[in-house]
Structure formats: C-alpha cells, structure tokens
Amino acid sequence: MAICNIIEDTNRTDEQYELINKQVRSSGPVPPEGCRLAVLGREWAITVWDSAEDRDRFLAERLGPAYQAMGLSLDEVTRTQFEVETLVAGDLAGMAQTAGSAT
C-alpha cells in the first residue's frame, strides 16, 4: 500500500536547504524510484511512495547522506507517515517544475 511521508525541518538554513536539494538531485533520478508525488517547501516535504521500502531506500541512500554532508541528521526532523487510501490529483502537466527542488 502507498504511504504518505511528511518531513518537517525548521532547523535548516536556506543555504543548507539548497545544498541538500542539489546533492539529492545529483545523486539519482528525480523523482526517486517509487516516489509518486512530492510537494516541497523550505520547512516541509510531503511525499507519496509506492511502499515504505522505497521511501526508506531513498532516505538511507540519498537524503540521509545529503543531510550528513551538511552536518545535519534526519534524526533531528519531525516525521509523520500514514497509509494512502486515495490519491486524487488534477492535471499536473501545466504545473511549473522547479529545477532546484527535490526530497
């Protein structure tokens, strides 16, 4: 079953946020394998994953190392997850896609 993962991180600086995003984007495909939706902001990342295993692999192999490179830890963020029963989205084809964002 799909899961929604919400990460809240109010402790990073704008510079750390940009550098983390840059490292994540350069370390593999965007969106990451198994990620169906990502809504990103400086303090929040809301993602929908095919499985907890896909999410955990991304955290361990890409986001965790990007945090560590900044001297930060994912242990310091607030994480919430829940099972997704229904996901409804409008036509996203016309939405702006920012080159500097990923989680």
Where is each model-derived feature located?
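Short S/T/G/P-rich N-terminal loop/turn motif that feeds into the first structured element of a domain
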Residues: 1-46, 50-65, 71-103
